[in-house]
A protein has these predicted regions:
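Short amphipathic alpha-helical segments and their helix-coil junctions
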Residues: 1-5, 247-249, 286-295, 337-342, ...
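N-terminal Rossmann-like or analogous alpha/beta NTP/dinucleotide-binding catalytic cores
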Residues: 1-113, 208-221, 263
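Glycine- and acidic
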Residues: 4-10, 38-42, 194-199, 249, ...
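Residue-level signal for inorganic ion chemistry
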Residues: 25, 56, 87, 91, ...
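Active-site cores that bind ATP or allylic diphosphates and position pyrophosphate for catalysis
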Residues: 95, 99-228, 233-241, 250-251
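Catalytic adenosine-cofactor/nucleotide-binding cores of aminoacyl-tRNA synthetases and other
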Residues: 221-382, 446-480
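Helix-rich, typically C-terminal accessory recognition domains appended to large enzymatic cores
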Residues: 416-461, 465
Length: 480
């Protein structure tokens, strides 16, 4: 069975590049009816933090994709050491008693790379056993073949055939001197033990894969199929990092800004992958059906943001499209906690009434606080009296319009259709265009010229609020 894994280390927040790796693994598993595994690679005890682990789980749960099995590497240490011991017993690893700070390097290989070289590689077995028995600490290193140069090869599902000379691969550690496994050993041991069929990870792991192929060969187990993903880069071409680019690289930044999880998944999956047609906005099921490793590009993918605008315009556009496509009930339930957190005691029925009026104007969920604030605030923020004056009109006309509107609203039924008919009739009786009446009324009740559809807005605000705000606008005009 197809089995894939996402294996974050709890040493930092959930990076959007890591989130994309998780998404691609999830899509691949769901497309093929396979198993999605979450494996926490927590063997680097000195760097692990509980805050990082919390951030990772919060980010993954927000993406709302889920996984089938969950493991921690720290609970599988016996398996790691078992593989290391098996490799050592075959003579394919050696004990290195060299203190970590005094390891030697040498320049070798066609690429002129600096590789770790230890004299311990040539230590006689009996001497190695004696020193180990005496309690002298040691690391365990993989004995990369040196007698005859050979090519380590594997086929990558994205980047194609890969090869590297053993002359350019150092004797890398399998176990540290404290007995803890290194990333290379733990990753391979767990990929083998969990029967991972495909390893899908970032292109920055490509060089590690040659070492992993050697480990799998030495352990006598089949290597999984590898697929490396192009990196996400900033507009200047640099790799995205929190130190350099700030919170824009963190998944929780997008969550807190008001992105929908399925819209954000839609955006991330299009960074380096294409459905082979011109579709942009896609449902989760549509993405699952279209996804393939063949659709992944090799070139690094730019996340387009600016210092004064932290979000990629494409991400914002996709989010707006998904907001419009969301059922009103679902969207209202997502908006309600945002409004309540801002201090407005709104109930769900009112939020259900407001949502269809404002969602066309929203790009992010948090926009509800700016496009619909007049529904929640008792008093409108200050606005210029001149905004009450309609086009091709003056203050006298604005005053007459609002006085007529107040009389009309006080005496008509407060339904959408009833308000529509009554206000149009009022404009006709005054001999003016409907827009010349609607404009002052809109500013009076909303505090702005650009607002949601007028009749629905009036209906939700209610007669008392509308009349009170119109009376306040009339008073402003009389002060001119």
């Amino acid at each position: 069975m197809l089995r894939v894994r996402f294996a974050p280390s709890p040493t930092g927040f959930l990076h959007i590049g890591s989130a994309r790796t998780f998404i691609f693994n999830w899509l691949f598993s769901r497309h093929h009816g396979g198993v999605m595994i979450l494996r926490i690679d927590d063997t680097d005890v000195g760097r692990n933090t509980e805050a990082s682990l919390t951030s990772i789980f919060e980010g993954l749960r927000w993406l709302d994709l889920g996984w089938d099995e969950e493991y921690k590497q720290s609970e599988r240490l016996a398996r790691h050491r078992e593989m290391a011991e098996a490799i050592f017993q075959k003579g394919l690893a050696y004990r290195d008693f060299t203190p970590a700070q005094s390891g030697e390097t040498e320049k070798s290989g066609a690429q002129g790379t600096w590789l770790f070289n230890s004299e311990m590689r040539h230590l006689p077995a009996h001497e190695s056993d004696r020193r180990a028995s005496s309690g002298e600490p040691f690391a365990l290193r993989f004995r990369v073949p040196r007698d005859t140069e050979r090519q380590v090869r594997f086929a990558d599902s994205v980047y194609g055939p890969q090869s590297k000379s053993t002359a350019d691969i150092e004797d890398f550690a399998l176990l540290r001197s404290d007995g803890m496994p290194t990333y290379h050993l733990a990753s391979c041991a767990d990929d083998a033990g969990l029967e991972i069929s495909h390893v899908i990870r970032g292109q920055d792991h490509l060089t590690n894969t040659f070492k992993h192929v050697l480990i799998f060969e030495a352990a006598g187990v089949a290597a999984p199929q590898f697929a490396h993903l192009p990196l996400l880069v900033a507009p200047d071409g640099t790799k995205l990092s929190k130190r350099r680019h700030g919170p824009v690289v963190s998944v929780t930044t997008y969550r807190d800004a008001g992105f929908l999880p399925h819209a954000f998944v839609n955006f991330l999956c299009l960074l380096g992958w294409s459905p082979k047609d011109d579709r942009q906005q896609m449902t989760r099921q549509e993405i699952v059906e279209a996804f393939s490793l063949e659709g992944i590009n090799r070139a690094n993918t730019e996340v387009n943001f600016k210092e004064d605008d932290p979000f990629d315009p494409k991400a914002v556009w996709l989010n707006a499209e998904h907001i419009r496509a969301l059922p009103v009930e679902d969207l209202a339930e997502r908006l309600l906690p945002i409004v309540r957190t801002a201090g407005f005691p709104v109930d769900l029925p009112k939020m259900l009434a407001i949502t269809p009026l404002v969602r066309e104007r929203m790009k992010l969920l948090r926009d509800v606080l700016t496009v619909a604030d007049f529904f929640f605030e008792e008093e409108l923020p200050p606005y210029e009296t001149s905004e009450l004056i309609p086009k091709k009109g003056d203050a006298a006309l604005a005053l007459a319009v609002l006085e007529q509107a107040a009389w009309t609203l006080a005496s008509t039924g407060f339904s959408h259709d009833g308000l529509d008919a009554a206000l149009r009739s009022a404009a006709q009786s005054m001999g003016i265009k409907a827009g010349q009446l609607f404009e002052p009324v809109r500013v009076a009740v909303c505090g702005r010229k650009t607002a949601p559809p007028l009749f629905g807005t009036l209906e939700v605000l209610g007669r008392d609020t509308c009349l009170r705000r119109i009376d306040q606008a009339i008073a402003k005009l009389k002060e001119l």
